[in-house]
């Protein structure tokens, strides 16, 4: 088979004046357009953002392993399928082991 990935640099520019750079949102759109129904196919959508993209870029140090750069994005989701289906926002991200962003989860307030 052919290795495929999902990505874009067309965000908030003259050609595409919309978007938020969310690869999870792009994978969800891809799944909707292709009418993806099965969890295995949703997991493939997630793989197109992660290991399939790394393979296309020929990244030898991709993945969580001793000695690798520790690049990771953390989602509040039980599975990759849930992250795609529910368009979950990242809670934190790390580049070379250093935290680069954090998003606090929403908090419901009591009515006054």
Roles of regions detected by a PLM:
Residues 55, 66-112:
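C-terminal cap of metal-dependent C-N hydrolases
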Residues 1-75:
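His/Asp/Glu-enriched, well-ordered alpha-helical/loop segment
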């Amino acid at each position: 088979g052919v290795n495929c990935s999902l990505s874009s640099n067309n965000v908030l520019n003259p050609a595409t004046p919309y978007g938020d750079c969310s690869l999870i949102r792009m994978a969800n759109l891809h799944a909707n357009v292709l009418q993806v129904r099965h969890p295995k196919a949703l997991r493939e959508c997630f793989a197109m953002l992660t290991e399939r993209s790394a393979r296309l870029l020929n990244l030898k140090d991709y993945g969580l392993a001793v000695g690798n750069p520790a690049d990771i994005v953390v989602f509040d989701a039980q599975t990759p399928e849930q992250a795609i289906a529910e368009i979950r926002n990242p809670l934190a991200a790390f580049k070379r082991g250093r935290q680069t962003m954090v998003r606090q989860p929403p908090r419901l307030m009591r009515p006054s």
